[in-house]
Amino acid sequence: MNILHSTLSTWRDRLAPVSRTSTFRTTGQITPEEFVLAGDYLVYKFPTWSWADASSPAKRVSYLPPGKQFLVTRGVPCHRRLNENFAGDAGHEDEIVRDMLSGADADDDDGWLRTGGGRDLAEKQAERIKDVRTVDESGNMGEQEDDEEDIPDMEDDDDDEEAIIREPAGKSTTQPTRTYNLYITYSNFYRTPRLYLSGYLSPSEPLPPHLMMEDIVGDYKDKTVTLEDFPWFDGGVKMASVHPCRHASVMKTLLDRADAALKIRRDKLKQAHSADQANRINSERGLEGLVDETRGLSLNEQQGHAAGGDEWEVLQHDEEDQVAIRVDQYLVVFLKFIASVTPGIEHDFTMGV
């Protein structure tokens, strides 16, 4: 049954009409050209990622150029298997990340599970959110602010140590380390990226496909992640794949939240009375308006600095229609939210170069 599903999925992608019209801002979907643009940005910013070709010309898809059929990063560590500490515990169920514009009665299928860490992690995250405050010019701490506050610079995030998720002290494990090769392909049917994972017990010993499910969170094993042949390789190489049916709606949610947060920042900058006050606004790192997986992302497009000028002057002249996340930054955000499916795999390792 799984073989039939994999075959049908492959042919559906290859036979679906190719969209050349950008609907990135309105639907969260991207065209093949935008996928290549986003892939080029990912490879440029994070050299652990690279473009790759299909194993043979017959395996290529016509809507992507030769040599840029998919993206790959190799040897990503996974130090621990997932258990109840990741999948949640009694009294603390996994949350659904909903579209910010939909009501409380929205169908759960319209959202994305926010998982990992159980009650303890959730409480710690809540405490961190409560600690976010503003400070006035006199140094007085203000009241807690509403969600969707400020967005950090994307260009400044590359060297931000706080953006890297690290193993908490005292939480070491004796479980054998696995490594994964991660592949990002383009789903022509859903018009979104799609992630495939191939695991290894050692550099020369592939991980049996069914054991990859030990590194997948809870309900995803049945609802979202399946074992399928990788369409770009000959020989039927079985991998775990995160189904893309909800990717567009989740990305649209993140885009909307980031834009709303950027608008709040821009409004605060307009009300700033000095460059120092503007710099304090820009230095704030609250990201409550986005899902936790996007913490530390660079979500603000920079226009560049005039000679002798500072960021205050540049941001004062931003266009009102400026967006928080450009289409070429799509895959960076995509990887941040997709990490919720496999929190044991150190996705940030791929962004540490």
UniProtKB/Swiss-Prot annotation:
Q: Give its localization.
A: Cytoplasm
Q: What is its main location?
A: cytoplasm
Q: Compositional bias (Acidic residues) spans? A: 143-156
Q: Annotated region Handle region: where?
A: 249-329
The annotated active site, in chain numbering, is: C245 (glycyl thioester intermediate)
MF terms (GO), sorted A to Z: Atg8-family conjugating enzyme activity; Atg8-family ligase activity
Region feature Flexible region, mapped onto this chain: 85-174
What are the BP-aspect GO terms? autophagosome assembly; autophagy of mitochondrion; glycophagy; nucleophagy; piecemeal microautophagy of the nucleus; protein targeting to membrane; protein transport
Q: Please provide the record's keywords in A-Z order.
A: Autophagy, Cytoplasm, Protein transport, Transport, Ubl conjugation pathway
| Bias (Basic and acidic residues) ranges | 120-136
From the UniProt entry, list the residue stretches annotated as the region Disordered: 107-156
Q: Name one GO cellular component term.
A: phagophore assembly site
Per UniProt, subunit arrangement is: Monomer. Interacts with atg8 through an intermediate thioester bond through the C-terminal Gly of atg8. Also interacts with the 40 amino acid C-terminal region of the E1-like atg7 enzyme. Also interacts with the atg12-atg5 conjugate.
Family, similarity comment: Belongs to the ATG3 family.
PANTHER family listed in its UniProt record: UBIQUITIN-LIKE-CONJUGATING ENZYME ATG3
Domain note for this entry? The flexible region (FR) is required for atg7-binding. The handle region (HR) contains the atg8 interaction motif (AIM) and mediates binding to atg8. It is crucial for the cytoplasm-to-vacuole targeting pathway.
Q: What does this protein do?
A: E2 conjugating enzyme required for the cytoplasm to vacuole transport (Cvt) and autophagy. Required for selective autophagic degradation of the nucleus (nucleophagy) as well as for mitophagy which contributes to regulate mitochondrial quantity and quality by eliminating the mitochondria to a basal level to fulfill cellular energy requirements and preventing excess ROS production. Responsible for the E2-like covalent binding of phosphatidylethanolamine to the C-terminal Gly of atg8.
User: What is the designated name of this protein?
Assistant: Autophagy-related protein 3
Q: What is the lineage of its organism?
A: Eukaryota, Fungi, Dikarya, Ascomycota, Pezizomycotina
